[in-house]
UniProtKB/Swiss-Prot annotation:
HAMAP family: NDH1_NuoB. This is NADH-quinone oxidoreductase subunit B. GO terms for biological process: aerobic respiration; electron transport coupled proton transport. NCBIfam families: nuoB_fam, PRK06411.1. [4Fe-4S] cluster binds at C32, C33, C97, C126. GO terms for cellular component: plasma membrane; respiratory chain complex I. It is a peripheral membrane protein. Binds 1 [4Fe-4S] cluster. Disulfide bonds: none annotated. The gene is nuoB.
Length: 159
């Protein structure tokens, strides 16, 4: 097993620290869970202390929080927003409806956001409390800190 150079591992930690403490979620509220998501931005829960600022543009976001029931009409639009987000990007699926379709088992409902885009963290509940979303953000921060910021599988130059 080949070890990464000391300089790269230190740079890795620095990049991951910066990324984990500056998460900008894309607000993608679809139903009741969106109200709980908005509550986390209020003064009582204060998402800003984690370095988290809600963004309305996917080009300024690195986290997508899917909050609510996802219909098949919305699925294509959500995929397009996800594709517009810069790398690295993460997804939090918030609530039973976003996770599994919830109680809406119909032809028009997507039975889980992970059928459309990859999901990193699932929040159970109907609707999950703001504290749960804060905890999910802290779990995501830990996941980012443990990941490799610098990819070793970069294409090799021939010349």
């Amino acid at each position: 097993m080949q070890q990464a150079p000391v300089v790269l591992s230190t740079l890795d930690k620095l990049l991951n620290w910066g990324r984990s403490n500056s998460l900008w979620p894309l607000t993608y509220g679809l139903a009741c869970c969106a109200i709980e998501m908005m509550a986390t931005g209020g003064s009582r829960f204060d998402f800003d202390r984690f370095g988290t600022i809600f963004r309305a543009s996917p080009r300024q976001s690195d986290v997508m929080i899917i909050a609510g029931t996802l219909t098949k009409k919305h699925a294509e639009f959500m995929r397009r927003l996800y594709d517009q987000m810069p790398e690295p990007k993460w997804v939090i699926s918030m609530g039973s409806c976003a996770n599994t379709g919830g109680m809406f088992n119909t032809y028009a409902t997507v039975q889980g956001a992970d059928r459309i885009i990859p999901v990193d963290i699932y929040l159970p509940g109907c609707a999950p409390r703001p504290e749960t979303l804060q905890y999910a953000l802290m779990v995501l921060q830990d996941k980012i800190r443990r990941s490799k910021a610098i990819k070793q599988d970069a294409p090799k130059r021939l010349v």
